[in-house]
UniProtKB/Swiss-Prot annotation:
Belongs to the SecA family. One of its GO terms (molecular function) is ATP binding. It is found in: Cell inner membrane; Cytoplasm. Monomer and homodimer. Part of the essential Sec protein translocation apparatus which comprises SecA, SecYEG and auxiliary proteins SecDF. Other proteins may also be involved. It is a peripheral membrane protein. GO terms for biological process: intracellular protein transmembrane transport; protein import; protein targeting; protein transport by the Sec complex. This is Protein translocase subunit SecA. It catalyses: ATP + H2O + cellular proteinSide 1 = ADP + phosphate + cellular proteinSide 2.
Length: 984
């Protein structure tokens, strides 16, 4: 009670935070008129002065990196707003500046859909870009990385900052002006998109200087090397690509191969919930072929097809696990003619059988994956998008390939891996944006140390969120969805329907084309009453309604389908989903990142109109572009008013997701920036969530109430049951992610040690000192191990002599000493002399340093690869320790530490042994050794694949093989060289 009173008096923590930031926004606003009075040239010069001040003043630079809001940060934010007005005709709202300040401070800004997150990121990106330490803007797909970099490019370029883009197809781009000479002129002549002295929040279309807008267009130009994108002040790319580049850098054999030259300074993660939570169970993995025969999966598949569910094996859908029953074990043993399936020699076979059961009974085609061109492609359950190149781990993908009768790709061995959780913790400052983060605030704080600040909307939110309609069967649910779409489509109201799978997506699409079903619905009395009532409310005559109804019944309901199979036109479909009469069916959050504007997007429409006239939008003249844009503005404004009168966009969800956040994201597609809109979920008791978590109680209630077919139930008890089910699943998933993080953090410490050592070797730090350090360590360890007694009289020196001979390749005299310390020191000095002789034999200190580097790097890489493989196996079996009353995590930490210590000792020993015994006559031979090692390394990388493998039962990434990428890179370089020659 007292807490509630205190909140009323002093406000919630979030309200206090927003209030604190408003003071800074007022300071930014005070600079607006002053900056507006400056010419373009003066503004550009001011930006350059500020850039120099931030990057050269070390103390100020550090304060900016830490996220302090200094007077320079205020000035940079004001400059960004002014640059956006002059180049794009967009002005940051106050709430967008608050969002930007939250990002600058290294927090998460929760901003509702349509509040302009893309523009919000520009202010913190510019001020942190001015430190010259690098800013990474992380998007969920390649298209958004390219689009956002190009769209916001004019702001950055105007203020003197360079922008790079990395894509998963291996291509790298730099943002450049389309016509640099024109821009130069426009800056000289003070040409602006937003007129001088105009201080309203939004610029009406008739006041936009369209010629100026076209002048400030940017384009993406391909760069020769990926490093170029990272050398820029700001780099756009996907989470996968930033992560894979980090791993590739740590597989590099020379300094020149490293691309992330600025390290990890500051990252702004767009759709932060999707990347840091939904994909947190996804380790990014670079792997090479492993020696496992794929024939075993064919045997397993043949066996599983003869087994019966519930008799021979059990399936737990909630926990996604499978087990053989006693009867099943005997049946398998009989079929395969073996005595004991659980014998150690059959462990791979047992594993393949269990994975095959999971492939057949837990993973469905067109829900969890699709088959295209003889390949099994994973579908992201959160977005409904195909994840090209990603493969399930642990043989599951191979089991599904056999099930579907497509070629089986061999299993892989890990070369390098990291989870997104640990990758993003590399950044000195991390920030993120999303429309829905509050429900996961605890996880953001606990795992990443990030606070969530909910940013107020620019205009009050007036969307109506209706209670769920719950039907007994899926069939009744789908009929009601079709009825809702039909009713609203007749009046021209745009409808967006969200489905959870491609299968549902395509099912609904066929129902909307089913004229027989549409007629049946149209003839129902309940539908006729609703139609009449809606027409009356909207003032539409019965004749008009009848005419439109007949038209729809004749042709079916025209609609756009958006799923993993039809992703090419994603942005275009979503951008026009708010037009009059538009019906869009999308899997979950497909199209996320593109706003649904009521009436449609004028710029997309203008491009479409030019294409219809046979004109390429990129090559259109200023006059053609201006004319198309004016017409597009007129059409969209007209349609916007009509859609508003109809109640705005209607969003229909067809199934509750495991996470409330995903449901909220779908609802959030309607009612952007104060627009009207409605949302409703139409669900059934046969949907997975209710079926697995508490649908029985609701089903009994429906039987008790004698609910007839086609009648929904609306009750608080049902809503509560759904919410409780979601909370249980969310808590379960959080624990899984937390556990994964705890396990990966053990490896993270080890990875850090190995990668730091690798980087030192590549950057040419004194390897010789490292070798001397190794020598001292090995001598100390061996003396203590082989001479356990303290008294020299009791020492048996033969084992030590044998070891020293094995190490150096020659007899080493053991000196007379008083104690172990003296022995260690004298042996160290003696072995150093032998090592110096070897150096003279090699030819020169420089040649020896290079040999040290190549040998240590090679041995370290081999040992780390084997260590990762050992850790994978350790992790698989560690959970069994729980049955013995031991904590698997503590056991894993202990054993992983011992394994790592042994690995490092072996690296030291093998490096010394190789260097002492190497037989090389000249420096040329050293270069040859180095060249051979590089070739071997290159072959390994060419065969490697990039994967994001999501634990046992899940999915995720591997864009193209590096072999393909390297080939493309070589081709691209040739083309660029040829182009340059032509120009010369």
């Amino acid at each position: 009670m007292l807490g509630w009173i205190a909140k009323k008096i002093i406000g919630t923590k979030n309200e206090r935070e927003v209030k604190r930031l408003r003071k800074f926004v007022n300071q930014i606003n005070e600079l607006e008129k002053e900056l507006d009075a400056l010419t373009n040239k003066e503004l550009v010069e001011l930006a350059q002065e500020l850039h120099d001040k931030i990057r050269f003043d070390e103390e100020l630079k550090e304060r900016v990196i830490k996220g302090e809001i200094t007077p320079e940060v205020i000035k940079a934010f004001a400059l960004v707003r002014e640059a956006a007005k002059r180049t794009l005709g967009l002005r940051h709202f106050d709430v967008q500046l608050i969002g930007g300040l939250v990002l600058h401070e290294g927090k998460i800004a929760e901003m509702k859909t349509g509040e302009g997150k893309t523009l919000v990121a520009t202010s913190p990106a510019v001020v942190n870009g001015m430190t010259d330490e690098g800013v990474h803007i992380v998007t969920v797909n390649d298209y958004l990385a390219r689009r956002d970099a190009q769209w916001m490019g004019p702001i950055y370029k105007f203020l003197g900052l360079e922008v790079g883009v990395i894509n998963s197809d291996g291509k790298t781009y730099l943002v450049e002006w389309v016509d640099p000479e024109k821009v130069k002129e426009a800056i000289e002549n003070d040409v602006r998109v937003w007129p001088k002295g105009y201080y309203e929040e939004i610029l009406p279309s008739e006041k936009v200087n369209i010629d100026a807008k076209k002048t400030y267009f940017t384009t993406l130009k391909e760069a020769e090397h990926r490093r170029k994108a990272y050398e820029a002040h700001i780099t756009y790319g996907t989470n996968n690509e930033f992560g894979f580049d980090y791993l590739r850098d740590n597989l590099a054999f020379s300094k020149e191969e490293i691309v992330q030259v600025k390290g990890h300074n500051y990252a702004i993660v767009d759709e932060v919930d999707s990347i840091l939570i939904d994909e947190a169970r996804t380790p990014l993995i670079i792997s090479g072929p492993a020696q496992i025969d794929s024939q075993i999966y064919h045997v397993a598949d043949a066996v599983v097809r003869k087994l019966k569910k519930d008799k021979d094996f059990t399936v737990d859908e909630k926990n996604r696990t499978v087990n053989l029953t006693e009867q099943g074990i005997k049946k398998v043993e009989k079929m395969l003619g073996i005595d004991n399936l659980y014998d150690l020699k059959h462990v791979d076979l047992l594993h393949a059988i269990l994975q095959s059961i999971r492939a057949h009974h837990l993973f469905k085609k067109d829900v969890h994956y699709i088959v295209r061109d003889g390949e099994v492609l994973i579908v992201d359950e959160f977005t409904g998008r195909v994840l090209p190149g990603r493969r399930w781990s642990d043989g599951l993908h191979q089991a599904i390939e056999v099930k579907e009768g497509v070629p089986v790709k061999e299993e892989n061995q890990t070369l390098a891996s990291i989870t997104f959780q640990n990758y993003f913790k590399l950044y000195r400052k991390l920030a993120g944006m999303t429309g829905t983060a509050e429900t996961e605030a605890l996880e953001f704080k606990e795992i990443y140390g990030l606070d969530v600040v909910v940013i107020p909307t620019h205009k009050p939110m007036i969307r109506k969120d209706h209670p769920d309609l719950v039907f007994k069967t899926k069939e009744e649910k789908w009929e009601r969805v079709v009825e809702e779409v039909l009713l609203n489509h007749i009046f021209g109201r745009p409808v967006l329907v969200g489905t959870v799978s491609i299968e549902d997506n395509e099912k609904l699409s066929s129902l909307l084309k089913n004229k027989k079903l549409l007629k049946e619905i149209a003839n129902r009395n309940s539908f006729k009453r609703r139609l009449e009532e809606t027409a009356k409310n909207l003032g539409v005559s019965p004749e008009e309604v009848q005419k439109k109804l007949e038209e729809v019944l004749k042709k079916g309901i025209p609609h756009n389908v958006l799923n993993a199979k039809h992703h090419e036109r994603e942005a275009e479909i979503i951008a026009q989903a708010g037009r009059v009469g538009a019906v869009t069916i999308a899997t979950n959050m497909a199209g996320r990142g593109t706003d649904i504007l009521l009436g449609g997007n004028p710029e997309y429409l203008a491009k479409q109109m030019l294409k219809e006239k046979g004109i390429n939008p990129e090559e259109a003249t200023e006059e053609q572009f201006r004319e198309a844009l004016r017409e597009a503005y007129r059409i969209t404004e007209e349609e916007k008013e009509k859609v508003k009168k109809l109640g705005g966009l209607l969003v229909i969800g067809t199934e509750r997701h495991e996470s409330r956040r995903i449901d909220n994201q779908l609802r959030g597609r309607a009612g952007r920036q104060g627009d009207p809109g409605e949302s409703r979920f139409i669900v059934s008791l046969e949907d997975d969530l209710l079926r697995l978590f508490g649908g029985e109680r609701v089903s009994k209630l429906m039987d008790m109430l004698k609910i007839e077919r086609g009648e929904p139930i609306e009750s608080r008890m049902v809503s509560k049951a759904l919410e409780n089910a979601q909370k249980r699943v969310e808590a379960q998933n959080f624990q899984i992610r937390k556990r994964l993080y705890e396990f990966d953090s053990v490896m993270n410490i080890q990875r850090d040690v190995v990668y730091t050592l690798r980087r030192q070797l590549l950057e040419g730090e004194n390897v010789h000192e490292k070798i001397k350090e190794f020598l001292k360590d090995i001598i100390t360890q061996k003396v203590n191990e082989l001479l356990p007694e303290d008294d020299p009289e009791l020492w048996d020196l033969e084992p030590l002599k044998a070891f020293l001979k094995e190490l150096t390749g020659r007899e080493v005299e053991i000196p007379q000493v008083r104690d172990k310390e003296e022995l260690i020191q004298k042996l160290y000095e003696e072995l150093l002399k032998i090592y110096e002789e070897k150096e003279k034999e090699i030819g020169s200190p420089e040649a020896m340093r290079e040999l040290e580097r190549v040998i240590l790097l090679n041995l370290l890489d081999n040992a780390w690869r084997e260590h990762l493989h050992t850790l994978d196996r350790l992790r698989e079996g560690i959970y069994l320790r729980g049955y013995a009353g031991k904590d698997p995590l503590i056991e894993y930490k202990r054993e992983a530490y011992e394994l790592f210590e042994n690995m490092m000792e072996n690296v030291k020993l093998n490096t010394l042994m190789t260097l002492f015994n190497v037989q090389i006559k000249s420096e040329e031979e050293i270069k040859e050794v180095e060249h051979e090692e590089e070739k071997k390394h290159q072959r390994l990388l060419e065969e490697a694949e990039l994967q994001g493998v999501q634990g046992k039962s899940d999915k995720k990434p591997r864009p193209k093989t590096l072999k393909e990428r390297l080939k493309e890179e070589r081709l691209r370089k040739r083309k660029l060289k040829a182009k340059k020659k032509e120009q010369e």
